[in-house]
């Protein structure tokens, strides 16, 4: 057949009369527009795709379950490319057969980040599949529906410099935590406590005596508040305090629900059947997130929650030995308290240590918060009233801590509701040296000895470091046991100090502050300068994460944030605000603030953006961020190879080279940056590879093990591969410096989970000597990707050290490092495909609300079988942009196999049901009126210039070649 008829009908036309047609359009069913924009808030009610109406940052982690399956808009592009690259194989029967690279095809489909969770209508009488648009409903025969996919776009706003074809790039940057705002860690009195002055003394030389209730400045029952004189006296150690539990208003209803469960348990005479662990965890979950919401939780949260539920079931059994001990009759013991005590024991055993407010798992954090509302300082009460002590197997120091009380808790500054002027405690964190004036000859080694004497300095523990090196030489790299905090001295150890645990309320001395309070700590190996101090709130709480809450806020520059390795001292959030589904809404101030950075215009000119918008679109910010990130990473890593230059010339380091010449594809993905690093620095190639090739190179390297992995590296990067092969005969330090490039292959990715939250990988650090340090990936001390890695690479050795002869230990260390990287699977903790790969529709819908509005369409591909195999695209859409532009956008969906797309037909429908048709390529059209009995409709006749269409199972065949 060379002609396809598509009926277009309005309300009142009997649909069953069109049963013989494979593709029909109902222009009588529509969603009313509001204010000239499509009402995207109706999407959850439509037969379209699965996006919930919720906060945009919450929506990023929604697992789509209300759908009829996923489709890939580019599945034809991928499979056609696989078809094009078939290889002929002569079989034993001398018959020639063709085989596609099915491994590549399967990887491409799995790696696609634009999967659409469709929620369609199914007509079981005629077996049609219905897809809703805002101006129409499209139905297609189920035999042909496998190539249908939505084609939605946000309309560009010229004043904002929009380039919405880069929406995927924006999506990518959020996933790799490079489009985020930060707030420093904030600490305050736990809102679950009332801290009451019980007694006072005039100076610290007077001890507090049991039973003494002497009051000097305050009346009985005075509660301590941070903006009150009582707090100053407390910090001076002049007050003896009593802690009582209280319920914050924000979680009062949730605590009441827990109380109902507790009361049912008590009234049933402690029947374990009344303890439904899943129901308990549901309420606790709400409490945990309201009190300290990090929005993104650990990937293994679900598994740990199940273990917690099992521990609850076990601990409430009537014959559990510890339960029997808790139920021994003593004065002051109450059943309500016992309920929360048993919850605490179950949670502590689940995590195998004491639980603190800073615990990363909300299911444990929340049970602590709930228990504190009833018991005050929980662990202290468990020890003094119930004779329960933390296990000897728990983390070090927890045994000694149960004698004290801890009144401070970490709170997320993004959510903390407080008026300007309120006193808080917070961590300042900045780079010790953002840049330095150096020469190639002197290098930029890590300086152990800061110029300021009035600081605490984080130092390496030579004994512990020596023990680690001996273990590595004798037994290889132990990724589970080698930790950075273990090789640092205890004083000023920024990986172990924790104000929540170090500031405590003692029985005799009142509150004692840690010695590092209000003092600068310099950690040279992290290039970090930190101080915890009292500060004031500067701005009210806002949904916009870019609003800086304090008078001394953390940096906003996205590249500086990538250099702040010690992420335990700040919180981050995607720089997005508002709802996932909205017709029109305000944009975060993030983009406007980033546009004020030095060099902003120069960076954008590299991307072809000459006119700089005052209020840029997020796609502009995304281009700026990734371009600057690429230049910064290249500049830092170039210092680690031997260079022919003026060794005494002074230059600023690190500093991105805005004049760096590179060619080829635009950089839209971190994998392109990583591949470019090796191409540019080692292979002297300035061409940027496309995103698919770059991602596949990284995948192939990860897929191999041992010698095969090194061979694949050498296949793509011959010069770098030969340098790795020469490690066995390494003679000077420069010969082993190339090892520090290997982590690039394994740390970054937008759909990966590290194998463990606290495994470490080896990295060379250059001080006055060459050291190897454990770089912890995915741990509580850093974020993800290259954040854990980048700042260490700012350090590089002097020329004298580069050319110094390797000692025997260094040579052995280098071989063990290469062995580790040849076999590591640190990146292979699984993925989160259902969540991560289905968010492109969400980003496009959200971006539409920030810019010019939303347009939608749906595309179907018709296979042509004669005289030459090809495809044509048929799209039904609204009329908000010219059809020629829509056709161009369809061509962009075929970056790998565009030669097969020989034409397109665009059917555009306006708000009142009128339609126009546009065609190009081998497609032409004719619109006719059709009378059927007493009913009328219109038929769009698509003609294909002598080409014959057919092959209903085109996609099925392509996926099985």
UniProtKB/Swiss-Prot annotation:
Similarity remark: Belongs to the orbivirus VP2 family.
Native source species: Bluetongue virus 1 (isolate South Africa)
Region forming the signal peptide: none
Functional summary from the UniProt entry: The VP2 protein is one of the two proteins (with VP5) target of the host immunogenic response. Responsible for viral which constitute the virus particle outer capsid. It is the major attachment to target host cell, probably by binding to sialic acid. This attachment induces virion internalization predominantly through clathrin-dependent endocytosis.
One cellular component term from this protein's GO annotations in UniProt: viral inner capsid
Location in the cell: Virion
Domain of life from the UniProt record: Viruses
Keywords: Capsid protein, Clathrin-mediated endocytosis of virus by host, Host-virus interaction, Inner capsid protein, Viral attachment to host cell, Viral penetration into host cytoplasm, Virion, Virus endocytosis by host, Virus entry into host cell
Molecular function terms, GO-annotated: structural molecule activity
The gene coding this protein: Segment-2
Keyword Electron transport: no
GO terms (BP aspect): clathrin-dependent endocytosis of virus by host cell; virion attachment to host cell
Pfam families tied to this protein: Orbi_VP2
Name of the protein in its database record: Outer capsid protein VP2
Keyword field contains Lipid metabolism: no
């Amino acid at each position: 057949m060379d002609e396809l008829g598509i009926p277009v009908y309005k309300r009142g036309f009997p649909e069953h009369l069109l049963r013989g047609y494979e593709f029909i359009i109902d222009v009588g069913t529509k969603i009313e527009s509001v204010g000239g924009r499509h009402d995207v808030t109706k999407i959850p009610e439509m037969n379209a795709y699965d996006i919930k109406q919720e906060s945009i940052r919450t929506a990023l982690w929604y697992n789509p379950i209300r759908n009829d399956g996923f489709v890939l808009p580019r599945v034809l592009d991928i499979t056609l490319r696989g078809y094009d690259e078939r290889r002929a194989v002569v079989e034993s029967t001398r018959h020639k057969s063709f085989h596609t690279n099915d491994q590549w095809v399967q990887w491409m489909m799995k790696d696609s980040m634009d999967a659409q969770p469709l929620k369609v209508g199914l007509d079981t009488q005629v077996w049609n599949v219905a897809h809703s648009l805002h101006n129409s409903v499209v139905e297609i025969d189920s035999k042909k529906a496998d190539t249908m996919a939505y084609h939605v776009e946000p309309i560009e706003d010229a004043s904002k410099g929009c380039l919405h074809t880069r929406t995927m790039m924006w999506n990518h940057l959020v996933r790799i935590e490079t489009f985020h705002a930060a707030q420093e860690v904030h600490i305050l009195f736990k809102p679950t406590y009332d801290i009451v002055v019980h007694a006072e003394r005039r100076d610290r030389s007077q001890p507090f005596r049991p039973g003494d209730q002497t009051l000097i400045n305050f009346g009985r029952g005075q509660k301590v508040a941070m903006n009150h004189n009582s707090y100053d006296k407390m910090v001076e150690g002049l007050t003896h305090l009593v802690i009582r539990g209280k319920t914050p208003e924000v979680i009062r209803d949730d605590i009441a629900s827990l109380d109902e469960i507790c009361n049912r348990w008590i009234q049933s005479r402690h029947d374990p059947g009344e303890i439904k662990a899943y129901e308990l965890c549901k309420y606790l979950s709400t409490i945990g997130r309201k009190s300290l919401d990090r929005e993104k939780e650990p990937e293994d949260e679900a598994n740990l929650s199940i273990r917690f539920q099992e521990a609850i079931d076990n601990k409430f059994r009537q014959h559990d030995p510890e339960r029997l001990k808790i139920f021994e009759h003593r004065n002051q013991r109450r059943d309500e308290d016992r309920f929360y005590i048993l919850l605490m024991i179950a949670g502590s055993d689940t995590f195998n240590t004491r639980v603190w407010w800073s615990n990363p798992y909300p299911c444990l954090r929340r049970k602590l918060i709930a228990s504190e509302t009833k018991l005050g300082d929980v662990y202290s009460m468990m020890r003094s009233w119930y004779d329960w002590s933390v296990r000897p197997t728990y983390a070090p120091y927890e045994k000694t801590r149960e004698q004290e009380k801890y009144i401070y808790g970490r709170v997320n500054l993004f959510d903390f509701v407080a008026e300007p002027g309120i006193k808080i405690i917070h961590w300042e964190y900045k780079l010790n040296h953002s840049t330095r004036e150096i020469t190639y000859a002197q290098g930029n080694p890590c300086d152990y000895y800061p110029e300021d004497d009035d600081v605490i300095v984080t130092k390496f523990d030579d004994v512990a470091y020596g023990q680690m090196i001996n273990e590595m030489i004798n037994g290889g790299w132990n990724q589970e046991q080698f930790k950075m905090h273990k090789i640092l001295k205890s004083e000023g150890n920024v990986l172990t100090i924790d104000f929540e645990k170090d500031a405590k309320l003692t029985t005799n001395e009142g509150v004692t502050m840690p010695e590092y309070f209000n003092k600068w700590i310099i950690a040279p190996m992290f290039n970090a300068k930190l101080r915890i101090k009292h500060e004031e709130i500067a701005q009210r709480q806002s949904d916009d994460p870019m609003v800086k809450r304090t008078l001394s806020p953390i940096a906003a520059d996205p590249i500086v944030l990538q250099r702040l390795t010690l992420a335990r001292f700040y919180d981050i959030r995607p720089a997005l605000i508002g709802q996932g589904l909205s017709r029109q809404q305000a944009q975060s101030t993030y983009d406007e603030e980033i546009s004020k950075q030095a060099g902003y215009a120069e960076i954008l000119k590299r991307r072809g953006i000459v006119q700089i918008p005052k209020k840029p679109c997020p796609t502009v910010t995304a281009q700026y961020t990734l371009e600057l990130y690429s230049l910064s990473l290249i500049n830092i890593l170039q210092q680690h190879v031997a260079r022919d230059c003026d060794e005494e010339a002074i230059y600023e380091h690190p500093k991105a080279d805005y004049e760096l010449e590179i060619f080829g594809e635009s950089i839209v993905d971190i994998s392109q940056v990583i591949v470019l690093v090796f191409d540019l620095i080692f292979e002297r190639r300035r061409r940027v590879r496309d995103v698919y090739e770059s991602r596949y190179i990284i995948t192939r390297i990860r897929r191999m093990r041992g010698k095969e992995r090194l061979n694949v590296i050498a296949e793509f990067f011959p010069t770098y591969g030969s340098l790795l092969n020469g490690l066995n005969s390494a003679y000077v330090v420069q010969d082993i410096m190339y090892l520090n490039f290997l982590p690039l292959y394994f740390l970054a990715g937008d759909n990966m989970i590290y194998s463990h939250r606290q495994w470490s990988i080896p990295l060379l650090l250059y001080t006055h000597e060459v050291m190897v340090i454990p770089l912890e990936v995915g741990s509580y001390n850093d974020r993800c990707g290259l954040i854990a890695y980048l700042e260490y690479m700012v350090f590089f050795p002097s020329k004298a050290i580069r050319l110094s002869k390797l000692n025997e230990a260094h040579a052995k260390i280098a071989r063990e490092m290469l062995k580790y990287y040849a076999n590591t699977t640190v990146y292979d903790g699984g993925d989160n495909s259902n969540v991560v790969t289905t968010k492109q529709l969400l980003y496009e819908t959200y971006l539409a609300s920030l810019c010019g509005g939303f347009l939608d369409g749906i595309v179907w591909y018709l296979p042509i079988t004669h005289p030459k195999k090809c495809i044509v695209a048929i799209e039904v859409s609204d009329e908000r942009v010219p059809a020629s532009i829509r056709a161009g956008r369809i061509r962009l969906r075929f970056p790998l196999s565009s030669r097969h797309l020989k034409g397109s037909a665009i059917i555009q429908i306006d708000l009142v049901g009128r339609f126009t048709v546009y065609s190009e390529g081998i497609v032409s059209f004719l619109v006719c009126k059709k009378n059927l009995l007493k009913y009328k409709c219109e038929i769009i006749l698509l003609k294909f210039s002598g080409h014959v269409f057919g092959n209903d199972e085109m996609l099925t065949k392509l996926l099985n070649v």
